[in-house]
Structures are given as structure tokens and as C-alpha cells.
């Protein structure tokens, strides 16, 4: 089991091309985070980051829908954590499960990909797919941080997750009628 903070710390090391910085909480933007600890070779990090960019910007990326209309590049990874085992001959149908048994949606990423200023790691409990649920929420956070925050706008609405869940789960349920 990994916490969102651990995911954020690992993603920060990726964004910094292998320079790990111990995570800390602060209300300030400019804080001395201590000396970075180098990990691995730069070429290896670039290959991984290219693959993470393809998750959002590649033709077959699992979060390509969340990147539509972007004027900056995000590097990210989606994930889906299964809560209950599904038999080999069975098919997963979220609409048929109690909400508490639905898959968790995960996303980790950073932006802009070439010169990161923000890392996002989120887990949406019982949210379904990381690409269709968590990545769009992360996109809202990235947009706020990179585009809107200096214009005095408010952070993304937390009801956005409920809206996504409705959009993702209701069509499947309607098809079964």
C-alpha cells in the first residue's frame, strides 16, 4: 500500500530527473527543501518522462482525453486499484457493485513536463478508472496552478469528482436496462 504523499514524493523525484527531495508541508511557495539526493542516470529519467507524456499526449494514452486543448504538456501515470476480486470468467461492472466495492482511480503527474512547477498525486476512492476519473481532476488542478491562480480565481470545485462519477457510471448502468 502506498500513500498519496509517497506517490507525490516519487513523482517529484521523476519530475526533477532523479533528484529526490524529502517532502514537507508548507503554506509558503518558496521554502528551502534541503539538498537533493541524486538517483540514477539522466538518460533513464528522460525515457520514463517521455513515456509519462505519452499517457496524456500520445494517440493511445490512457489519459489522452484529459489533455485535450492543453497549451502545456503534462507527464503522468494513471492507475486503477481493484477492491474486490473478479472471477476469471466474470466481467467487471461497476454499476452492479456497491459503491464501496468499486475500483479506486489514481493519477500522478507533473507539469509543465519540461520544467515542472507542480506535482499532483491523487487517489479517488471508488472512482473507477484513473484515466477517465482521476486524470481530469488532476487537469483541473494543473490548470488552476499554471493558468488561473494569479488571476484571483478560486481552486477547482470539489464537486467535480461527483460530476465525473455520474458521467462515467450512469451510461453503463443505463445500457443494462
Language model features with spans:
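Gram-negative outer-membrane assembly/targeting C-terminal domains
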Residues: 148-177
Amino acid at each position: 500500500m502506498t500513500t498519496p504523499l509517497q506517490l507525490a514524493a516519487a513523482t517529484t523525484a521523476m519530475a526533477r530527473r532523479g533528484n529526490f527531495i524529502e517532502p514537507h508541508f508548507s503554506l509558503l511557495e518558496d521554502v528551502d527543501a534541503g539538498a537533493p539526493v541524486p538517483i540514477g542516470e539522466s538518460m533513464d529519467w528522460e525515457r520514463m518522462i517521455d513515456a509519462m507524456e505519452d499517457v496524456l499526449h500520445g494517440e493511445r494514452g490512457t489519459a489522452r482525453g484529459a489533455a485535450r486543448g492543453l497549451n502545456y504538456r503534462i507527464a503522468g501515470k494513471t492507475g486503477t486499484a481493484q477492491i474486490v476480486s473478479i472471477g476469471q470468467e466474470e466481467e467487471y461492472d461497476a454499476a452492479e457493485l456497491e459503491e464501496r466495492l468499486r475500483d479506486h482511480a489514481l493519477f500522478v503527474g507533473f507539469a509543465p513536463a519540461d520544467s515542472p512547477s507542480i506535482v499532483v498525486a491523487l487517489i479517488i476512492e471508488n472512482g473507477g478508472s484513473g484515466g477517465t476519473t482521476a486524470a481530469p481532476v488532476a487537469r483541473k488542478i494543473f490548470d488552476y496552478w499554471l493558468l488561473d491562480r494569479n488571476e484571483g480565481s478560486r481552486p477547482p470545485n470539489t464537486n467535480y469528482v461527483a460530476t465525473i462519477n455520474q458521467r462515467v457510471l450512469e451510461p453503463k448502468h443505463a445500457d443494462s436496462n
